[in-house]
């Protein structure tokens, strides 16, 4: 029976040097069974006093008696565990499993037990991944803030809590259902522990967005029906002031119109939502092609989230509309009558006027927007990828304070040591490596110990590393169960996330270690968490071009088939790449450069690909919503300028509302204490803001005006090869379809993507 989740982080990359080093340590018995934590103690007057030794011994005795603890090494048992000035020391506590396998309550109790011994000048802090995860909150505040913000926007848009609640209910149901599936899947597929909040973030944003578009079209069709049967003018139906019986009779009488409105909304906006959802899923599944450990599981989980939210919008939402249709209809008509009584201007006038202004000065609009996006994207060129560590935690946490104490006492590189594996198991005693066979006593038959060659090689390496710029200290060779394998721990002079440390790893692998290998005939591998983070970052950078090509290529083919154009997909791809670059530039400025007082550090290695996948898909949504309406007008009028103005007029308000909701949901995650979620939320919020403001309002109308009729050009040979895919409902315009009939007040106000009947 499967109970609970089994989330686990796996950033190992088979084929990388750090992964090979880790495998060697596991095979040769050098890797401990469980994770370890450090209990850091400090006294400015020195730790080597009888009183402190007694207090620390009592603390460690009690710690050793705790559940999940298998071994404890006192700082007084290892001279290297006390700083040179004697003020900082650390005890190593080995757990009986990996950090995620040890119950959180056991880890919290360890913190409490150890810190109970503070006093008389002794300071006690705890560090390690097990401690960091124990201090993490359960979350929920960011998600709640996002939902509240989205609900407020919807209430202002629709003027009704019931109407505003339907998209939120649909999104919550979809996300909740997917969460249950993912919890079960975590027992069979590797899923990172940050998968649930990412699913919540994407699911809420996309789910509310999709439901909003269908619901908006439904409201529009209710107004069309009301305009046709006289209800809108007050000649039919019953408002809230009528009796209950009268309202029920009116609801029954309007039931066929409600059902027709729901069918049209699904047939029109539903097609758009389906296509938009498919583009997001394609982009997310593109991450799977990267082959980056648990990131593949994250890609599948988020793709499933989008799929379920899309299906919920196409199935659950119509059911809710059926249940609340009468009440929604009364609210829609009541609001429309109030707007008519106020003499409100035709909806979309402001957007139509804006489009005309951009069309009169297309080059100026294009230049301003592109320069702004380019300037914001420029910092992304200097982006450094990596992983946050305890040095990025809040200063109030014990893990951050332990990190700082160790850096003060032992140097900044102590928190990110490099583990060098010396593997002589494949070394040939008769190697031609500079006479190494003679120096090592080339005849094992003479009785020399098997471990002597690797011991000598490790000694040679240690001497070399001690003279290497950028290395502060090197441990003596550490033997393993296999005498042909030994370990050395090299402590960089720079912090784990510093660029100098990254350069040091490259220098060791490309220059220093190959020379020692040639001299000794022993293979050396650089491993450890710091080296593994570098490997992951480099692998991401190597595979990103393929990933981008797959996502952009497939999305462009879909757009080409839908809009029968070569230039439209090309324009969409370039603009999306520009907005994504700008959002990554914003993330770089804030989190890497430390703008607004944020702790400086690298951008999480997987953030760029995840932001690219999600933003590219969502940007395509807005592209499809807008261009579908423009395309429809173009097919009927063959006037490109008119088509663009009408496209903006009929989609501007709903795209703005949808974008505002996504921005609020995504930006709420900046409130999360998790640095990775903060980066993700900021990147997505900035990307959607730029897409809705600069791209949809300036660049798209400017480019479409400049392209004119050429925007819809498609070579005849290519037209024959591409399948015909239509999003907009293609029917003859006339009285039955609403053409020629007076537009219902507020109809344009709530048009989804402008996809008419």
Role assignments for model-derived ranges:
Residues 1-5, 69, 84-86, 97-385, ...:
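Membrane-embedded transmembrane helical bundles of large multi-pass transporters/channels
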């Amino acid at each position: 029976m499967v109970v609970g989740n089994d989330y686990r982080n796996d950033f190992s990359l088979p084929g990388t040097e750090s992964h090979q080093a880790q495998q060697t340590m596991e095979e040769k018995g050098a890797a401990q069974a469980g994770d370890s934590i450090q209990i850091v103690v400090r006294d400015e007057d020195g730790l080597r006093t009888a009183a402190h030794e007694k207090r620390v011994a009592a603390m460690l005795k009690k710690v050793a008696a705790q559940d999940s603890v298998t071994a404890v090494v006192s700082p007084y048992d290892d001279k290297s565990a006390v700083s040179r000035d004697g003020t900082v020391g650390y005890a190593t506590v080995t757990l009986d499993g990996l950090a995620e396998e040890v119950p959180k309550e056991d880890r919290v109790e360890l913190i409490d037990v150890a810190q109970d011994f503070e006093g008389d000048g002794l300071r006690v802090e705890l560090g390690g991944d097990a401690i960091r995860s124990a201090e993490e909150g359960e979350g929920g505040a960011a998600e709640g803030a996002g939902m509240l913000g989205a609900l407020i926007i919807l209430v202002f848009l629709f003027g009704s809590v019931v109407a505003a609640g339907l998209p939120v209910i649909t999104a919550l149901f979809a996300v909740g259902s997917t969460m249950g599936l993912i919890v079960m899947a975590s027992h069979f597929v590797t899923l990172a522990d940050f998968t649930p909040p990412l699913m919540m973030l994407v699911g809420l944003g996309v789910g509310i967005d999709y439901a909003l578009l269908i619901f908006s079209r439904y409201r529009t069709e209710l107004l069309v029906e009301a305009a046709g049967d006289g209800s809108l003018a007050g000649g039919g139906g019953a408002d809230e002031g009528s009796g209950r019986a009268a309202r029920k009779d009116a609801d029954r009488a309007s039931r066929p119109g409600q059902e027709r409105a729901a069918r049209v909304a699904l047939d029109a906006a539903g097609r758009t939502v389906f296509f938009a959802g498919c583009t997001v899923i394609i982009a997310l599944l593109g991450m799977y092609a990267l082959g980056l450990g648990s990131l593949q599981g994250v890609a599948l989980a988020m793709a499933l989230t989008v799929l379920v939210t899309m299906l919920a919008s196409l199935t659950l939402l119509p059911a809710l509309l059926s249940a609340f249709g009468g009440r929604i209809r009364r609210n829609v008509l009541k609001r429309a009558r109030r707007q008519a009584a106020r003499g409100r201007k035709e909806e979309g006038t402001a957007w139509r006027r804006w489009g005309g202004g951009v069309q009169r000065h297309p080059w100026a609009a294009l230049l301003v927007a592109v320069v702004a996006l380019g300037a914001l994207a420029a910092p992304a060129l200097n982006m450094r990828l990596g992983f946050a560590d305890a040095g990025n935690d809040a200063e109030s946490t014990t893990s951050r304070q332990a990190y700082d104490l160790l850096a003060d006492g032992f140097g900044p590189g102590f928190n990110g040591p490099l583990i060098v594996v010396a593997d002589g198991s494949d070394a040939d005693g008769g190697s031609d490596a500079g006479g190494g066979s003679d120096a090592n006593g080339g005849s094992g038959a003479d009785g020399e110990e098997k471990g002597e060659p690797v011991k000598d090689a490790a000694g040679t390496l240690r001497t070399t590393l001690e003279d290497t710029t950028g290395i502060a200290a090197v441990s003596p060779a550490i033997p393993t169960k296999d005498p042909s394998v030994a370990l050395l721990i090299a402590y960089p002079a720079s912090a784990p996330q510093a660029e100098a440390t990254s350069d040091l790893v490259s220098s060791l692998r490309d220059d220093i270690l190959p020379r020692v290998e040639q001299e000794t005939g022993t293979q050396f591998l650089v491993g450890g968490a710091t080296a593994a983070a570098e490997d992951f970052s480099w692998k991401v950078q190597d595979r990103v071009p393929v990933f981008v090509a797959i996502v952009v290529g497939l999305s462009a083919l879909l757009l080409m088939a839908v809009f029968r154009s070569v230039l439209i997909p090309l324009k969409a791809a370039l603009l999306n790449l520009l907005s994504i670059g700008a959002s990554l530039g914003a993330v770089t400025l804030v989190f890497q450069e430390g703008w607004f007082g944020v702790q400086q550090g690298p951008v999480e290695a997987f953030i760029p690909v995840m932001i690219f996948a999600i933003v590219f898909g969502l940007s395509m949504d807005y592209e499809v919503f807008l261009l579908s309406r423009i395309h429809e007008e173009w097919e009927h009028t063959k006037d490109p300028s008119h088509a663009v103005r009408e496209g903006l007029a009929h989609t501007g308000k709903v795209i703005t509302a949808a974008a505002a909701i996504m921005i609020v949901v995504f930006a709420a995650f900046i409130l999360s204490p998790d640095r990775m979620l903060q980066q993700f939320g900021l990147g997505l919020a900035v990307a959607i803001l730029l897409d809705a403001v600069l791209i949809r309002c300036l660049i798209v109308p400017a480019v479409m005006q400049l392209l004119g009729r050429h925007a819809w050009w498609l070579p005849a040979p290519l037209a024959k090869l591409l399948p015909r895919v239509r999003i907009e409902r293609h029917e003859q315009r006339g009285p039955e379809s609403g053409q020629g009939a007076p537009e219902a007040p507020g109809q344009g106000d709530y048009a989804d993507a402008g996809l008419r009947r």
